[in-house]
A protein has these predicted regions:
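Catalytic histidine neighborhood in serine/cysteine hydrolases
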Residues: 190-209
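Short beta-strand/loop motif that positions the catalytic acidic residue
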Residues: 169, 175-177, 181
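Catalytic histidine-centered segment of alpha/beta-hydrolase-like enzymes
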Residues: 207-220
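Gly/Ala-rich beta-loop-alpha elbow adjacent to hydrolase catalytic centers
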Residues: 60-64, 68
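Conserved HGGG/HGGXW glycine-rich cap/lid loop of the alpha/beta-hydrolase fold
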Residues: 1-47, 61
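Conserved alpha/beta-hydrolase catalytic His-Asp/Glu region
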Residues: 92-95, 110-168
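Short alpha-helix in the alpha/beta-hydrolase fold that links the catalytic acid
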Residues: 171, 185-194
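Flexible "cap/lid" loop of the alpha/beta hydrolase fold
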Residues: 73-74, 78-117
Length: 229
């Protein structure tokens, strides 16, 4: 019997974010959640819960991590396992919000492709910047509609501080992060893993903020171990 698994994408990502990992997980029944319709993290979480099986394992990357933490807040009894990849329990700083607003202004001016290209050095390990992974990430981000991107940024900026809540998580938990993640550095994953009882921290070598595409073998291996807990 296949294990239900809900996978939540990050900002300006679609199901492609998870495709290489899904191909390596042969004991799951994966569903990639839709996070394109809501402008709040709580709204995204509620929509996912309405469509999800009664009980399921749950993984989110980056913005997806903010959403899965909200799902745990709303319905902890429905989740069997929790994975937090390249994400952060802290709220945005005012400096980070200002940077987001500047990017949003560029998108409103029709410069989505420029924003995508400028963002790649923060998303990928240096070794992955010249090659098929970088091109695939760029194509994925511009595939996501500008209106979706703007809604998601609004949701991210308004997210709560999840740090006080981490100690209450009572699930088999994987915290994973690319060793070269510049956008959400590994120290923030270490912080979460230390706060969640029994959490396992896995660092993916030669990967930045998107290890599901940069290091899918390592991510799938960690997730198989996690799902077997």
């Amino acid at each position: 019997m296949f294990q239900p698994l809900v996978l939540v994408p990050g900002l300006r990502c679609d199901a492609y974010l998870w495709h290489a990992v899904i191909a390596r997980l042969d004991t799951t029944a994966p569903v990639v959640a839709d996070v394109s319709l809501d402008n709040t993290i709580s709204g995204m979480a509620s929509r996912i819960l309405a469509a999800a099986p009664p009980r399921f394992a749950l993984a989110g990357l980056s913005m997806g991590g903010y959403v899965v933490l909200e799902i745990i807040r709303q319905a902890p009894e429905r989740v069997t396992h929790l994975a937090l990849l390249d994400t952060n329990a802290r709220p945005d700083s005012e400096e980070r919000k200002a940077a987001r607003r500047a990017e949003m202004d560029l998108v409103r001016e029709g410069k989505s492709a420029l924003v995508s290209r400028l963002g790649l050095p923060n998303l990928l390990a240096p070794a992955n910047l010249d090659g098929p992974v970088a091109q695939a990430v760029h194509e994925m981000t511009i595939r996501v509609a500008d209106a979706v991107y703007l809604r998601q940024q609004e949701a991210i900026m308004a997210r709560p501080d999840s740090r006080p809540f981490l100690k209450d998580i009572a699930l088999p938990t994987l915290v994973g992060v690319g060793a070269e993640d510049k956008l959400i550095p590994p120290a923030l994953s270490e912080e979460m893993a230390a706060a969640i009882p029994g959490a396992e921290l896995v660092v993916f070598p030669n990967a930045g903020h998107i290890p599901t595409l940069e290091a899918p073998d390592a991510v799938a291996t960690a997730m198989k171990t996690w799902l077997a807990r």
